Amino acid sequence: MMEVNSTCLDCRTPGTIRTEQDAQDSASQGLTSALAVVLIFTIVVDVLGNILVILSVLRNKKLQNAGNLFVVSLSIADLVVAVYPYPVILIAIFQNGWTLGNIHCQISGFLMGLSVIGSVFNITAIAINRYCYICHSLRYDKLYNQRSTWCYLGLTWILTIIAIVPNFFVGSLQYDPRIFSCTFAQTVSSSYTITVVVVHFIVPLSVVTFCYLRIWVLVIQVKHRVRQDFKQKLTQTDLRNFLTMFVVFVLFAVCWAPLNFIGLAVAINPFHVAPKIPEWLFVLSYFMAYFNSCLNAVIYGVLNQNFRKEYKRILMSLLTPRLLFLDTSRGGTEGLKSKPSPAVTNNNQADMLGEARSLWLSRRNGAKMVIIIRPRKAQIAIIHQIFWPQSSWATCRQDTKITGEEDGCRELCKDGISQR
């Protein structure tokens, strides 16, 4: 009986091993597929979103200020990983290993580090800019004039390059098969890993935390009228801009904190801590960090009204590159109309098409207006106004930065419209 049981156990053991191995392989394939899906989604949103951010600032003069210069810089840093490192990681995932050679591995690791550190330092620069704008408003124009702002931006990227160069001398850029990436190896040098975490993560985030805490304190004091001596009036736009960048900071900290704290723990006691870290947690911490690069552009669109409006204009211009017809004659947006205005005759239609960026229809107090926006001269011309029951022509022109908001157009022309 003992021999039979022993024989049966011997017969079942290989099958059990194969079953466990098959389960592990299946789980590994499922995890790999999930990582590929997450990375593809991140690349698409990263590229489209950050291009929208850059185009929005370039197109809209309302967004062209010192603070948004660092926002564009942050978008460029986020774009870097989507253009090269993430695609080669995808290749490694599909090939189930690194097949591109050591040169591509080093380039990918360098650009990955450049993007990450550039993002950290740009977020820090944005926080300092917001702090100076709100807490030291009287000196802000001197601190952030055009020349000094470009100097700050250049300094940000110089520090970024200086911070990433030591990786080549330490030899810490290596391929890690668990995450299919050529990245910073946490176990190469404990002292260097601790230095990286402190300089690249803890110190910048401490500076950002200090800046935003001071802003929050000031906002609360002004709101409850504790600071009667505060000269600048905090507008809702200022508060929304501050809130937007604060959310950017919080999400960055949340996405990157697990990876940095794991690296710090491993560096302090590598032989004891490293074997105890589950592989799924290690992989999750990396892909959380990777995912962060696509979030900022989404945050701007959700929380910042100016960016959201410019996103819509850019996307609409892709659908109707010559004219956009927005009908709000019934008090709400009904959609885009692809029909020309009845005011546009055969004689002047070509000229209007040539200089018009978009066509906006609205009705207010029984009047229907067609507004042509001229992007080159930033002018608004109300070329047709129909009153019920009678019709009349009216024109109003003025150099302005208004870009089509209904309230702005009403203010522009309410004081007097010259009859043709």
Swiss-Prot record:
Glycans are attached at N5. GO terms for biological process: G protein-coupled receptor signaling pathway. GO terms for cellular component: plasma membrane. CDD domains: 7tmA_Mel1C. Disulfide bonds join C105-C182. SMART domains: 7TM_GPCR_Srsx. The keyword Glycoprotein applies. The chain crosses the membrane at residues 35-55, 74-94, 107-127, 153-173, 193-213, 246-266, 280-303. It is a multi-pass membrane protein. It is found in: Cell membrane. Moderately expressed in dermal melanophores. The keyword Membrane applies. Pfam families: 7tm_1. Residues 56-73, 128-152, 214-245, 304-420 are cytoplasmic. GO terms for molecular function: G protein-coupled receptor activity; melatonin receptor activity. Residues 1-34, 95-106, 174-192, 267-279 are extracellular. Keywords: Cell membrane, Disulfide bond, G-protein coupled receptor, Glycoprotein, Membrane, Receptor, Transducer, Transmembrane, Transmembrane helix. Belongs to the G-protein coupled receptor 1 family. High affinity receptor for melatonin. Likely to mediate the potent effects of melatonin on pigment aggregation in melanophores. The activity of this receptor is mediated by pertussis toxin sensitive G proteins that inhibit adenylate cyclase activity. This is Melatonin receptor type 1C. It comes from Xenopus laevis (African clawed frog). The gene is mtnr1c.
